[in-house]
Amino acid sequence: MKDFKIYLSTAPVVAFAWLTFTAGFIIEINRFFPDPLVFSF
């Protein structure tokens, strides 16, 4: 279990989790408040 925690704290895993969270957050913001520059018909 100790090795698994060390693996989860490595830079690529942390970066992947952070970018996934950021992308999901941006997608949800754009779903509720669409960008006015994009015309959705």
From Swiss-Prot:
Cell compartment(s), UniProt: Plastid, Chloroplast thylakoid membrane
Membrane-topology annotation of the record: Single-pass membrane protein
Function: May help in the organization of the PsaE and PsaF subunits.
Pfam family name, one: PSI_PsaJ
PANTHER family, alphabetized: PHOTOSYSTEM I REACTION CENTER SUBUNIT IX, PTHR36082
Family the UniProt entry places it in: Belongs to the PsaJ family.
Gene3D superfamilies noted in UniProt: Single helix bin
Superkingdom of the organism of origin: Eukaryota
GO BP: any one term: photosynthesis
Transmembrane segments: 7-27
This protein's name: Photosystem I reaction center subunit IX
Organism for this UniProt entry: Stigeoclonium helveticum
An example Gene Ontology CC term for this record: chloroplast thylakoid membrane
Keyword annotations from UniProtKB, A to Z: Chloroplast, Membrane, Photosynthesis, Photosystem I, Plastid, Thylakoid, Transmembrane, Transmembrane helix
SUPFAM superfamilies: Subunit IX of photosystem I reaction centre, PsaJ
